[in-house]
Structures are given as C-alpha cells and as structure tokens.
Amino acid sequence: MATVVIKIGGSTLEALEEGFYEGVVKRASLGDKIMIVHGGGPAINNLLQAMAVESQFVNGLRKTTAEVLTAAETALSGQINKQLVRSLYQAGGKAIGLSGSDGHLLKTIPIDTDKLGFVGAVESVNVDVLFNVAKAGYIPVIAPIGMDANYQPYNINADTAAAAVAKASKAEELVFVTDVDGVQKDGKVIKEMDEVLAKHYIEEGVIYGGMVPKVNACLDSLSGALTKARIVNGKKAYHPSAGTAIVKQSNVLTSGA
C-alpha cells in the first residue's frame, strides 16, 4: 500500500476524461492512499475578469493582492475543489474537499510581501488531517490556499503545495497530471529516467518548451521517502505505470520507450 500525491494543474482540469477519475478511484480501492492537490489558474482568470481586477505574474507566480486573493480562494476552494470532488464521486469513489486553511492543513509563510503580496510557501503540513480523511475511506482533495500563524490566508503555487504534501506524508510517488502522454524522445514516450538523464536531456534540448518546468518540478520533488515522480496524460485513463517516471536512483540504463 503506497501513499500517492496527485497534482492536477488548472489548465488540465477541463480536459480530464472520466477514465482518469475511474483509474484514480480504482487505485484507491486497491489500498493506496491517494491525495490530490489542484490548481485553477483559468478559473481564477475568469473570475478576475468578471470582477474587473487585473493581475500580474512575477517570476511565474501570480502577484496576489487582497482582491486577487479573494478571487483565488473563491475559485480554488469553491468552484474547482468541489468540481473535482463531484467527478470522483461520479467515478464511484469517495472524496472530501479541503482548503489548506482547513485544520491548518498548510501552515504558510509569505515569500516576499513587497513583490508578491499574499503568496506563500508551505512551512509545514498537518498530515494528521490527511491521514484521518484517508483512514475514513475518502480521497482528500486539497485547494492550495494556506494560512499563517496569524490566520492570514495565502495563495500557494500548486506544484509547491503538492511537493510539500508529498514530502510531509512520506509519499512514495508524486504524479503531475498534464495534457501530454509524458516526456518524448524521437516521437516515443520515455517510460523511465533518472535525475542525471533528465538533466542531460534538458541540456541537450531533448526536453524543451513547456515540458522543462514540468520535469524540473519532478526533480525538485525527489527528496526523503519520495523516490519517483511521474508525468501522465489526464486525457487518458490513469494507471500506475502511465506516462514518464523520473526516479531518484541512477538505475536506469536506457531511456527506452
């Protein structure tokens, strides 16, 4: 029985097929502890547009004013979180939607208030909340809105939140759900590669464009008990060996598809 953290990006949500949710539910039914962390950038953008509020990005992070924070919390903890919960139920599973503020799940500290406003980094994770939810037979679905020691909410990058949850829960695997089949070389999906090979492929340009930050997020997550990160296509049925696995140990001799 493994603990698996699945990160679903906001831009991927609308493309997820029913088969993906069914695969997640099946894996949970076989005994794995599944924890989901999600983003919601497009939903936040739509809400900000409706509110006539402009936002900007600094080094890839959304600068979060008080107005932007309200939109982010509404879209993430409300709309997107509950959409995912409903989809898991429709696939035959059981899920509970949580914000990082619930149970002080994601204790947060500001990154740089002057430059980023209410954007936070995860200081600690209350894993007891997650394990209690999982023990009761539910899949926790986490919106990345954290809270500091003074109960101020913060917007957290979903990749960062997922990595923090994976590390704190001592997960064996972290899965990044995207809209592609995995990392490709010569038109074929690479089934598995280690850290050294992944960095080499980035340097050589085999891994390029939008895949680079995804692979870097996988590399950054490989710490502690986490020995494997995986990139999968959310448009297809999810199963444990799908996509590309990036592993900690240098045991991969080839990049064979």
Curated annotation (Swiss-Prot):
Keywords: Amino-acid biosynthesis, Arginine biosynthesis, ATP-binding, Cytoplasm, Kinase, Nucleotide-binding, Transferase. Its EC number is 2.7.2.8. The keyword Nucleotide-binding applies. InterPro entries: AceGlu_kinase-like_sf (IPR036393), AcgluKinase_fam (IPR004662), ArgB (IPR037528), Asp/Glu/Uridylate_kinase (IPR001048), Glu/AcGlu_kinase (IPR001057). It is found in: Cytoplasm. GO terms for molecular function: acetylglutamate kinase activity; ATP binding. GO terms for biological process: arginine biosynthetic process via ornithine; L-arginine biosynthetic process. It is an enzyme of class 2 (transferase). Substrate binds at residues 40-41, 62, 155. Pathway: Amino-acid biosynthesis; L-arginine biosynthesis; N(2)-acetyl-L-ornithine from L-glutamate: step 2/4. It catalyses: N-acetyl-L-glutamate + ATP = N-acetyl-L-glutamyl 5-phosphate + ADP. Its main location: cytoplasm. GO terms for cellular component: cytoplasm. The record marks 7, 214 as: Transition state stabilizer. Belongs to the acetylglutamate kinase family. ArgB subfamily. PANTHER family: N-ACETYLGLUTAMATE SYNTHASE, N-ACETYLGLUTAMATE SYNTHASE, MITOCHONDRIAL. Catalyzes the ATP-dependent phosphorylation of N-acetyl-L-glutamate. This is Acetylglutamate kinase. The lineage of its organism: Bacteria, Bacillati, Bacillota, Bacilli, Bacillales.
